[in-house]
Amino acid sequence: MRTEYCGQLRLSHVGQQVTLCGWVNRRRDLGSLIFIDMRDREGIVQVFFDPDRADALKLASELRNEFCIQVTGTVRARDEKNINRDMATGEIEVLASSLTIINRADVLPLDSNHVNTEEARLKYRYLDLRRPEMAQRLKTRAKITSLVRRFMDDHGFLDIETPMLTKATPEGARDYLVPSRVHKGKFYALPQSPQLFKQLLMMSGFDRYYQIVKCFRDEDLRADRQPEFTQIDVETSFMTAPQVREVMEALVRHLWLEVKGVDLGDFPVMTFAEAERRYGSDKPDLRNPMELTDVADLLKSVEFAVFAGPANDPKGRVAALRVPGGASLTRKQIDEYGNFVKIYGAKGLAYIKVNERAKGLEGINSPVAKFLNAEIIEAILDRTAAQDGDMIFFGADNKKIVADAMGALRLKVGKDLGLTDESKWAPLWVIDFPMFEDDGEGGLTAMHHPFTSPKDMTAAELKAAPENAVASAYDMVINGYEVGGGSVRIHNGDMQQTVFGILGINEEEQREKFGFLLDALKYGTPPHAGLAFGLDRLTMLLTGTDNIRDVIAFPKTTAAACLMTEAPSFANPTALAELSIQVVKKAENN
């Protein structure tokens, strides 16, 4: 039906007869001439109808936005004064000789001249996706997956599919369950990841595996989370953690070079402990120059319990954040930041405003200065490298609250004051995570997943001191986003059972949920390691949007609903009966 795409016409096509198919993006009626901007997935081209083709001109008078049409015409160069430098096709136009209206469009529920609500965009997603910026994002996503496949193929990885209907295993979130009609009362689970299957593929001898795969997690949603999402899933045998990172870093550098024309360079490597200490986050945004500075040792003897308490507590921390130029902040802004850190558990926000260091105590403004002597204040200013015009904020509490609150404050202030260089790319690897973390109920939970290997520990050493274990795990972070994470896996049955035991999974439950894995570990399992990237998040970064729904064709809302299809919906009672399922309705509160 077409000979060319609208958006691909150039001066090289001048004089050629072309047939185009697409939609009316805009129509301008000048009486004797009608101009339309005609759009397809590749872009927009100007088409005009003149009186010499009376039939086409008459039909063109009926055109409205989003009519689906076919046009045949001749490509012509525009006059110099009519060239549109803002359009890729702006040097040419098409003189139409014939027009076919394939399908007309009703009054549109979306307004192309105004910003539409996200609810409307999701309800009429098929119209929203016609917008050039949305089409470009999905084209970029397709380019990314194509680049990934070629790269992985060139590096000897095999694309192997793993099951969608599988067994429920604890991986940190709730499973989406699928009832079995054949096996009454039993359920499959949709995979949260192909984790165990890709490990089993390594045990099967496939050495290098990858898959671009859908994953499902029934968890509370955030702006950058979806109940179904796509991973670039990777697993290798006989490769160390640094070797895995090297190949995966090469992949990401390749993507940025091909999609953005940017060489990311070598990625720095930082331990989890260093990231938390310097940035209050295990996914630091290195475009932001501010760092946290520990000052607890300077405050142990002060008569100010807010500082002295955490300073003398082994589980406490007092950290300072120097804000260059922050002395210009108003009292209202400071109060707003004080309320902001309370979201993360902090009780408030102490500060020192540095007006003129040379004047000593008279050169600063601080509600806590009266609790600190001149020597301590000077030591704090020295350690934070404070200069005239700076602001120093303080966080004092247990280590987690200080890291969470001050890390979030660092990001917010960096953005608010323009300190974060948003023109840069700042990738890094974060390694050496704690293997376990407190579950809040006196037990331990895996920080990543229960199949991650400890670093340089035997099973006996791990069992004796699990709280000291460092995981052989690594995350890739770009501009403050965790885009991928992985680890060396446990390849020894005793170690795997030890980890299960630490996590409170008894032997009976181990056999019930992971018997197939424990059996496989008995038969010559190779050392193996892997990683998974979030394709949606990678695409979000590479297309410059901050909304993950912009890079998914048909996403869900934050309530895990599809406004277009109205899923989820009630099931047919007959279908439920065949599955031996009865829906129990909870009584509504009056």
UniProtKB/Swiss-Prot annotation:
GO biological process: aspartyl-tRNA aminoacylation
Signal peptide start-end: none
Entry keywords, A to Z: Aminoacyl-tRNA synthetase, ATP-binding, Cytoplasm, Ligase, Nucleotide-binding, Protein biosynthesis
Region (Aspartate): 195-198
Subcellular location, record wording: Cytoplasm
PROSITE patterns: AA_TRNA_LIGASE_II (PS50862)
InterPro entries xrefs: Aa-tRNA-synt_II (IPR004364), aa-tRNA-synth_II (IPR006195), aa-tRNA-synth_II/BPL/LPL (IPR045864), Asp-tRNA-ligase_1 (IPR004524), Asp-tRNA-ligase_1_N (IPR047089), Asp/Asn-tRNA-synth_IIb (IPR002312), AspRS_core (IPR047090), GAD-like_sf (IPR004115)
GO molecular function: aspartate-tRNA ligase activity; ATP binding; nucleic acid binding
Keyword Protein biosynthesis among UniProt keywords: yes
Pfam families xrefs: GAD, tRNA-synt_2, tRNA_anti-codon
Keyword Aminoacyl-tRNA synthetase listed: yes
Catalysis performed (reactions): tRNA(Asp) + L-aspartate + ATP = L-aspartyl-tRNA(Asp) + AMP + diphosphate
CDD domains linked to this entry: AspRS_core, EcAspRS_like_N
GO cellular component: cytoplasm
Ranges annotated as spanning the membrane: none
Binding-site list for ATP: R217, D218, E219, Q226, E482, G534, L535, D536, R537
Enzyme Commission identifier(s): 6.1.1.12
Chain positions recorded as L-aspartate binding sites: E171, R217, H448, R489
Subunit structure: Homodimer.
Family affiliation: Belongs to the class-II aminoacyl-tRNA synthetase family. Type 1 subfamily.
Primary role: Catalyzes the attachment of L-aspartate to tRNA(Asp) in a two-step reaction: L-aspartate is first activated by ATP to form Asp-AMP and then transferred to the acceptor end of tRNA(Asp).
Name this protein carries in UniProt: Aspartate--tRNA ligase
Species, as recorded: Escherichia coli O7:K1 (strain IAI39 / ExPEC)
